[in-house]
């Protein structure tokens, strides 16, 4: 899917060099079709890196995707130039009157922080509640999935004894839903989190449909019956080197982390890691965009209202 982004956004140059179809504002102005409007709430410290990763995932379809970048507070980022944030990001007050086809809320390095201690927790609650009536489908990634379970279902934070880091096998539990169309019965996906998503706990306390689960990592992919909220507990958008950089960051910080599981050849951090989840990541985002966003969203977003009930898919 050609993604429509500002001409000067750093991701435009990077993705163009990768032969990914990027449509700048000037070119998109000559196409007389309505692009899908996707809002990205980027909570990750390295914002440019995350922008590139997610825009890469959104790029494989013949439709335009117009991406708006959202920031949640005015604190200066230690890892992203201030001028970049001021140039390309909007705050909630600037977009709250808009409606969107899709919303992606990223993870955040807050696994050991209680929700009430998160500086922007109240604003995040406001955004999630706002999305119910102003977004067709919202995709929550990693920490955002845990935060959404708290906001939408009242579930308290469940934390693992040690950080889960690595690439794990997952079993597809649902055959018919289009969100998992084309998934292998067993597939790999990366995780980097302290959050726990045990299947029994999720099943006992929510009405979510669970689509994929791992013996080591727990629930990986779930969604509400009306497809309006999608929960991904891992990081399918990660580049091949992202877990590597996080591992060395933790080493430098003296955390003494475990070597990411199933990641380095021979479990040797000196060897270049495999990117064994690439095809899965692209397929997950493509399915979400096509079936949960494009197929369900109204042409006139002003008519968007909260849907009720499930969707009868014809497979």
Curated annotation (Swiss-Prot):
Gene source species: Tolumonas auensis (strain DSM 9187 / NBRC 110442 / TA 4)
Q: What does this protein do?
A: Transfers a succinyl group from succinyl-CoA to L-homoserine, forming succinyl-L-homoserine.
Keyword Repeat included in the entry's annotation: no
Reaction equation(s) it catalyzes: L-homoserine + succinyl-CoA = O-succinyl-L-homoserine + CoA
Site Important for substrate specificity — annotated at 192
Q: Which family does it belong to?
A: Belongs to the MetA family.
Return the protein name.
Homoserine O-succinyltransferase
Q: Give compartment(s).
A: Cytoplasm
Cytoplasm found in the keyword field: yes
Name the major location.
Answer: cytoplasm
Question: Which EC class heads this enzyme's classification?
Answer: transferase
Q: Which gene codes for it?
A: metAS
- Keywords for the protein's UniProt record, in alphabetical order: Acyltransferase, Amino-acid biosynthesis, Cytoplasm, Methionine biosynthesis, Transferase
Q: Where is this site: Important for acyl-CoA specificity?
A: 111
């Amino acid at each position: 899917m050609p993604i429509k982004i500002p001409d000067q956004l750093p991701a435009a140059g990077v993705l163009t060099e990768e032969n990914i179809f990027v449509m700048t504002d000037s070119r998109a102005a000559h196409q007389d079709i309505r692009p899908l409007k996707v809002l990205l709430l980027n909570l990750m410290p390295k914002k440019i890196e995350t922008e590139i990763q997610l825009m890469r995932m959104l790029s494989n379809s013949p439709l335009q995707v117009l991406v708006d970048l959202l920031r949640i507070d005015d604190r200066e980022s230690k890892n992203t130039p201030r001028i970049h944030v001021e140039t390309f990001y909007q705050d909630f007050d600037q977009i709250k009157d808009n409606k969107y086809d899709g919303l992606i809320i990223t993870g955040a390095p807050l696994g050991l922080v209680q929700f009430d201690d998160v500086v922007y927790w109240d604003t995040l609650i406001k955004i999630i509640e706002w999305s119910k009536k102003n977004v067709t489908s919202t995709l929550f990634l990693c920490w955002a999935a845990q935060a959404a379970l708290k906001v939408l279902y009242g579930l308290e934070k469940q934390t693992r004894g040690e950080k889960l880091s690595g690439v794990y096998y997952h079993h597809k539990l649902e055959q018919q839903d289009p969100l998992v169309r084309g998934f292998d019965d067993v597939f790999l996906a990366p995780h980097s989190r302290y959050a726990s998503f045990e299947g029994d706990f999720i099943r006992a306390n929510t009405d979510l449909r669970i689509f994929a689960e791992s013996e080591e990592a727990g629930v990986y992919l779930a969604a509400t019956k009306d497809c309006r909220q999608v929960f991904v507990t891992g990081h399918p958008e990660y580049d091949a080197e992202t877990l590597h950089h996080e591992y060395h960051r933790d080493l430098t910080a003296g955390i003494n982390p475990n070597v990411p599981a199933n990641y380095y050849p021979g479990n040797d951090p000196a060897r270049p890691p495999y990117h064994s989840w690439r095809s899965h990541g692209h397929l997950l985002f493509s399915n979400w965009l096509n079936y949960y966003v494009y197929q369900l969203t109204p042409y006139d977003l002003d008519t968007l209202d909260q849907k009720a009930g499930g969707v009868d898919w014809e497979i």
